C-alpha cells in the first residue's frame, strides 16, 4: 500500500531536535468555552486569531517537523493526540509506530471503498488512548453523528469512556470544543449539542 504524504513545507524545528509539546498560552487557558471568548474585547481576540487559525490548519493538514535531524510528517489527528490529548501519564510521547498507525488510519478513513481496519496489537501499546483520541477528534468536527465504543463487556466500554475519552475531551482548548450539553465529566455520553430549553407560556 502506497500512501502519499503532503509536500514537505514549513518544517518546524524544535530546540530538542524531537517532538515537543507547544506551550498553551496562559491567558487562553483561562478561557473555558466559546461563550467566555465572546466576552473578551475585540483587540484581545485579534492578538490570538493567528495562533488559533494555525492550530486549525495543523489539525486539518498535519504537521512537518524535524525529528532527530530527519523531516517527519504527522497527520492532523496525530497532532491532536500529541499536542492536546491527556493520557494516564500526562502528555503522550512520540512513537514511530504510532505515527505509522495514524498515517494508515487516515488513509483508511479517506478511502470510501474501505470498511475499516484490523489492527493486531500488543499490550501497553497505547492503542486505547489513540483510538480514544481519534474518537474525540472526529466527534468534535462532525455534525449529526454518533460515535460508539465496542468492547468485550459493557463495563470495559464504560471504563474506556470515563478514563480515556472524557479526559481527552476535557483537555481540548476552548476553540476546539463544541457546545456541550450536560456535565463536564459525564458517565455515559458526551453530547456536543446546544442544551435543551423549556417552552414557556407568556
Q: Where do the model's predicted regions map?
A:
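Phosphate/NTP-binding elements of NTP-utilizing enzymes
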Residues: 1-202
Amino acid at each position: 500500500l502506497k500512501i502519499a504524504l503532503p509536500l514537505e513545507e514549513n518544517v518546524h524545528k524544535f530546540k530538542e531536535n524531537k517532538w515537543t509539546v507547544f506551550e498553551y498560552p496562559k491567558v487562553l487557558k483561562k478561557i473555558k468555552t466559546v461563550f467566555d471568548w465572546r466576552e473578551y474585547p475585540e483587540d484581545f481576540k485579534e492578538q490570538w486569531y493567528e495562533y488559533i487559525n494555525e492550530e486549525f490548519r495543523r489539525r486539518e493538514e498535519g504537521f512537518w517537523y524535524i525529528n532527530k535531524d530527519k523531516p517527519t510528517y504527522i497527520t492532523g489527528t496525530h497532532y491532536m493526540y500529541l499536542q492536546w490529548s491527556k493520557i494516564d501519564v500526562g502528555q503522550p510521547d512520540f512513537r514511530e509506530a504510532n505515527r505509522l498507525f495514524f498515517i494508515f488510519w487516515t488513509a483508511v478513513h479517506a478511502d470510501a471503498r474501505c470498511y475499516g481496519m484490523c489492527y493486531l496489537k500488543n499490550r501497553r501499546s497505547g492503542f486505547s488512548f489513540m483510538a480514544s483520541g481519534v474518537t474525540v477528534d472526529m466527534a468534535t468536527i462532525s455534525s449529526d453523528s454518533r460515535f460508539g465504543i465496542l468492547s468485550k463487556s459493557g463495563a470495559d466500554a464504560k471504563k474506556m469512556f470515563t478514563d480515556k475519552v472524557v479526559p481527552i475531551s476535557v483537555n481540548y482548548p476552548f476553540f476546539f470544543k463544541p457546545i456541550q450539553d450536560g456535565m463536564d465529566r459525564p458517565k455515559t455520553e458526551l453530547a456536543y449539542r446546544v442544551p435543551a430549553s423549556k417552552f414557556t407560556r407568556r
